[in-house]
Structure formats: C-alpha cells, structure tokens
Amino acid sequence: MGAQSHSLEITSSVSAEKIFSGIVLDVDTVIPKAAPGAYKSVEVKGDGGAGTVRIITLPEGSPITSMTVRTDAVNKEALTYDSTVIDGDILLGFIESIETHLVVVPTADGGSITKTTAIFHTKGDAVVPEENIKFADAQNTALFKAIEAYLIAN
C-alpha cells in the first residue's frame, strides 16, 4: 500500500473556536443551512465523537456520489479533528482510505487558520492524480467558505 500526503490551509476572519464548531462540532446542522445543496443526505451513526460514522450521499450530477467517514478523534480544547474516509466511490477504486488531520489555529487578529493534511492510502503503487487533488481542494474550500459566511451572518 502506498501513501500520498497533501496539505491545505484556509485563512478566516472567524475565530478558531467558532470555525471549529462550525466545521466539526456542529457540522451536521450547519451544512444544511450554509450550503443546502452540498449533500443529498447524511446518516449519522454515533454521538459525533470518536467512532462516529457518517454515510454521506452527494447530490445528483456530482462526480462523486457517496462516502463513508469515520471520526477517529476530536479534541475540543486543542481544536483538532481526525477522520478517515473508509468507503464510497470517492475512493475511486484505487484508494484504500483517506486519513484527514485537521487543526484550527487562532491568529493574532482574532481570526484563524484551518490546516488540513490528507493522507491517501492507495492500493499498490497507485498515485492520486493532481487534478483529483485540485478538485478536492476546490470543493473543500468552497464548502468551508459557505460555512464561514453562514457563521459570520449568524
């Protein structure tokens, strides 16, 4: 099994605690309000903490239709969240799993930087194409910005 790592940082004017709540702790209630068309459905099995599984179905017309995400760890004090995509067509047939490590860091101006590292565990020596990574970055950034706008407005 191969491993390929990719990092993404997004700066926000919203405080670290509020962003962490919006993208991690309250994500199941925030996304339907902030980005109503982002998900067709989300089935949550668990209480949101470690071991929780979310079965996510994406809307018609999306190049990806499903993903199952397991929460591995949530630390509310350190503002960290670890999860793993364990199933769904998002794995593209050549990825075993996608491990994600997220940390939200406060900035001196009262805003925050969200740092995400994704580790793609691939089958054999497969490599995730750069265009797939760029597409994922664009989708994740758009969803983040929708949540950020919602948090600013509310």
Curated annotation (Swiss-Prot):
Molecular-function GO terms, alphabetical: abscisic acid binding; protein phosphatase inhibitor activity; signaling receptor activity
Protein's UniProt keywords contain DNA-binding: no
Annotated Gene Ontology cellular component terms: cytoplasm; nucleus
Keywords from the UniProt entry: Allergen, Pathogenesis-related protein, Plant defense
SMART domains found in the cross-reference section: Bet_v_1
InterPro entries found in the cross-reference section: Bet_v_I/MLP, Bet_v_I_allergen, Plant_def-hormone_signal, START-like_dom_sf
Gene Ontology biological-process annotations: abscisic acid-activated signaling pathway; defense response
Keyword Endoplasmic reticulum assigned: no
Effect the entry attributes to changing L102M: In Dau C 1.2 and CR16/Gea20
Pfam family, one: Bet_v_1
Subunit (UniProt): Homodimer.
Family (UniProt): Belongs to the BetVI family.
Name under which the protein is recorded: Major allergen Dau c 1
